Amino acid sequence: TKIEWCDSSWSPITGCYHACPYCYARATANRFKGCDIAESGEADTFVVDLKERLKVTNKDGVTRNAAYPFGFTPTFHEYRLDDPKTKGFGKTIFVCSMADMFGSWVPEEWIVKIFDACKAAPGHRYLFLTKNPQRYIDLYNAGILPDGDEFWYGRMPAL
């Protein structure tokens, strides 16, 4: 990653409904999208759950992996859950750099699966950022938010 404060980024969720005008992630995802299924600001409940990687074919017949097959529509890339196990040991990993993992539209089940994947790959430092810090509190109160030294939580300013 080119982000100076982490060694790696890992985005098992991509996409967001905040519609921030300065969002680099939205621009990147839309540049490499496969198709349009939801527009920015559309219903905050529309999400996609992918079990395996998709490929897209462009108008010239070239097929490629689709990192963001649905643009910036919130998408859970479940096939990426084992990625931290491949990153060696002792890395600082920015989790969901291409999404707000704690947005109100993200199903709790997705969050739990990501925390479980982090726990299954110990020895890293996992960094989480959100514009919805209330979700941290809700998950903590529900006994879901991990509190070990390897889990770091922060917030981004809301619009």
Language-model features: locations:
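Conserved Radical SAM active-site core
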Residues: 1-159
